[in-house]
Amino acid sequence: MSSKVTVIGAGNVGATIAYTLASDDIASEIVLIDINKDKAEGEVMDIIQGTSFRDPISIVAGEYQDAAGSDIVIISSGIGR
């Protein structure tokens, strides 16, 4: 399947969604966005390492403008506690 999915929020929920999208071959391109860029980049590295035996996909830690052209945008960010 050739689809682009953006996940906004790289916390527990957002990172799990991104991992599931990658591991189940649901999307061919995933953009993970978080206010904490380092957090998003770390989660992307973990997902890439955890899905190394799957078909290659594009997964990046990005900015809001990288969401352009997404087929689906998932907002998993919430209010800071």
Where are these regions (language model features)?
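Conserved N-terminal Rossmann-fold NAD(P) cofactor-binding segment
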Residues: 33-69
